[in-house]
Structure formats: structure tokens, C-alpha cells
């Protein structure tokens, strides 16, 4: 791209020079030559010291935009030189530098996006005309339903009520003791088993336990009486509740793309080890024609729990029987 720019600049300069020569010959007046380097000469006074007519456009560009780390006249850009100075791309310092540069670039990009009215307009247009994705957003419908249930279903169980009341009383006692405020029911707490009972004798502990049991049984009796009264007088009363129920619609099945390597197991399949007694090439040969080592043959026979001499005898007997059958077939019959 830089070479094309050089060629275009040279071609334009030649055309302008030829046009000015023609105009001077016609009008016989000197005409000012507008060089491509005049803009750089006006903007960058530091470049005026050198002869810009002989300088290449690439050098002028690199000197004018010296602050840009992506443009370099030599072999490496300023950012690459800094990375090499830190010891290379694999060093910790170079990675920190690259991370810092990336964060700085993202921060600058966000600032420019906030200042740009075109970006805001594009984002508003995208929000208006973008359709919700069926895969990203689940299709749901909210319905209001009426549920009729008895009042007993909304009551707290008696055991939980007792635990909550005990917890409330403990918190009140702790707050009163912390604020040094005497309460009228502190004596009742001290008699009951809410306290640990440290420093009391065995008789006092038994009395406290009996009082606690009596207190619990009394509460249970009161609760049973309340339940009976409510069951007798309020059996017919029911309550209606309005609640929002969410029904998830049937989502479309996602099309999963499978690759050939995905179906393979992650661990490589174990190759069957070659064993001496296994199915090898020597099973294709006869025992006498096997071109292997005798030691391996011996190991094979030992693994099969056979002896070499017995196998040779059986094989020789089989050969003799086969030979006899062939001879019988070959002999003519005499009538």
C-alpha cells in the first residue's frame, strides 16, 4: 500500500510539473509549484531543516506522525522496540505492557463512543429495529390464577410457633441484659431452661426441667384447644388468592453441530498388546513350517499347556492318516 502511495505521489508531481511548464510557456509568468510536501512543511516546522524535496513521502509521514506507535520508518515500531527492550514478548513485563496498552485503547474507545453522536444514533437504531432472539430470550407467558385453599394451610405449625416465641424471648432478654435494663419477666427466664443452668445443683436442674415440661405441655394443650375450636366453627371458610403463574412455552430445539472428533473418546483407545499365546501369524503356519524362534514356540506351548513332542506326534499321525486316505483313493479297484 505504501509503494502504491509513493507511485501515485510521483505520478501526480510529474503531471503538475508538466502542467506548470505549459502554463509558463503560454503566459510567460512564473507559476508557484504546489508540492505535496508543502502541507507537511507548514504543519511540522521541525521537518523544514531537511530538504523535503529529496525526502520520500514515507519518511515525511513517519516524522509527522512520530507519536503513533504503529508507524515506523525502520525495522521495528516504537511499541516493538519497547517490547524488545523489556526482553521479548514472553516476559512478564512485556505482557503487562501489552495489557496496559489494551486497557488504555479500550478506555479511549469508550470515551470516543460517548462523545460521538453517530454512535449514539446507531445504538438507538439497533435497539429499535433489533428483534429478540428466540434462543437467547426464553418465550414465557405470565398468567394470573386463582387458588382457593383453607385457612389451615396458611397457618404456621405449632412446633415452629414455639421455637419462634422462644427465640424472640431470648433476643429480648439478651438486649435487656446488654442495655442493663431490668425487665419484669427476667425472673421467669432465669427459672426456665433458657439459661444454661451452670452453678445449679442436680435438684435445681430437675425442678427447672419439670417446669419447662409443664410449660410446654400447657402450650400444647392450649394449641390443641384452639385447633379444635377453629375446626368446629370455621370448617366452611376458605380464602381466595391471586398469584402469578409462569408457563414456559415450548422452546425450539437447538441444532447442535457435531464434528467427527467430538464423538471420539478423549483418551486414546488402548491397542491390544501382542502376547505370545495370542492370535498371531504363527497360528497360520503349521508347527513344523513355522519360521520363528524355538524359544517362542516353547513359550507358546507352555502357555497352552502342551508339550512339543506330543504335538509333533499328533501332527505326524494326522499326516499319516491323510496320506493313507489319499493312497486308498488313488489305488484302482480290482473286480
From Swiss-Prot:
- Compositional bias per record (Basic and acidic residues), positions renumbered to this chain: 210-235
Going by the entry's taxonomy, the superkingdom of the source organism is recorded as Eukaryota
Q: Name one Pfam family in it.
A: DUF5520
Q: Which InterPro entries match?
A: DUF5520
Q: Where is this region: Disordered?
A: 201-236
Role: Dispensable for normal development and fertility.
Instruction: List the PANTHER family hit by this protein, alphabetically.
Output: MCG1612, RIKEN CDNA 4933402N03 GENE
Annotated protein name in UniProt: Uncharacterized protein C10orf120
Upper taxonomic classification of the species?
A: Eukaryota, Metazoa, Chordata, Craniata, Vertebrata
The gene coding this protein: C10orf120
Amino acid at each position: 500500500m505504501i509503494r502504491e502511495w509513493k507511485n501515485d505521489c510521483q505520478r501526480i508531481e510529474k503531471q503538475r510539473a508538466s502542467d506548470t511548464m505549459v502554463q509558463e510557456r503560454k503566459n510567460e509568468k512564473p507559476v508557484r509549484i504546489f508540492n505535496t510536501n508543502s502541507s507537511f512543511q507548514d504543519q511540522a516546522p521541525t521537518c523544514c531543516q531537511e530538504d523535503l524535496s529529496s525526502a520520500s513521502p514515507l519518511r515525511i509521514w513517519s516524522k509527522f506522525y512520530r507519536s503513533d506507535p504503529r508507524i515506523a520508518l525502520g525495522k521495528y515500531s516504537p511499541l516493538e522496540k519497547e517490547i524488545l527492550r523489556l526482553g521479548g514478548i514472553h516476559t512478564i513485563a512485556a505482557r503487562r505492557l501489552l495489557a496496559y496498552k489494551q486497557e488504555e485503547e479500550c478506555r479511549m474507545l469508550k470515551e470516543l463512543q460517548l462523545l460521538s453522536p453517530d454512535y449514539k444514533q446507531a445504538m438507538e437504531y439497533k435497539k429499535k429495529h433489533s428483534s429478540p432472539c428466540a434462543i437467547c430470550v426464553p418465550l414465557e407467558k405470565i398468567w394470573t390464577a386463582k387458588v382457593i385453599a383453607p385457612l389451615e394451610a396458611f397457618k404456621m405449625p405449632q412446633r415452629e410457633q414455639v421455637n419462634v416465641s422462644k427465640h424472640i424471648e431470648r433476643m429480648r432478654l439478651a438486649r435487656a441484659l446488654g442495655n442493663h435494663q431490668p425487665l419484669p419477666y427476667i425472673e421467669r427466664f432465669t427459672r426456665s431452661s433458657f439459661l444454661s443452668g451452670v452453678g445449679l445443683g442436680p435438684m435445681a436442674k430437675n425442678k427447672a426441667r419439670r417446669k419447662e415440661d409443664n410449660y410446654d405441655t400447657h402450650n400444647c394443650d392450649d394449641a390443641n384447644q384452639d385447633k379444635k375450636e377453629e375446626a368446629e366453627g370455621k370448617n366452611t371458610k376458605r380464602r381466595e388468592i391471586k398469584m402469578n403463574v409462569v408457563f414456559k412455552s415450548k422452546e425450539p430445539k437447538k441444532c447442535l453441530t457435531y464434528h467427527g472428533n467430538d464423538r471420539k473418546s478423549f483418551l486414546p483407545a488402548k491397542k491390544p498388546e501382542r502376547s505370545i499365546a495370542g492370535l498371531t501369524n504363527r497360528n497360520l503356519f503349521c508347527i513344523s513350517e513355522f519360521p520363528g524362534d524355538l524359544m517362542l514356540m516353547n513359550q507358546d506351548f507352555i502357555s497352552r499347556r502342551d508339550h512339543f513332542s506330543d504335538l509333533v506326534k499328533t501332527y505326524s499321525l494326522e499326516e499319516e492318516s491323510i496320506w493313507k486316505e489319499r493312497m486308498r483313493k488313488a489305488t484302482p479297484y480290482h473286480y
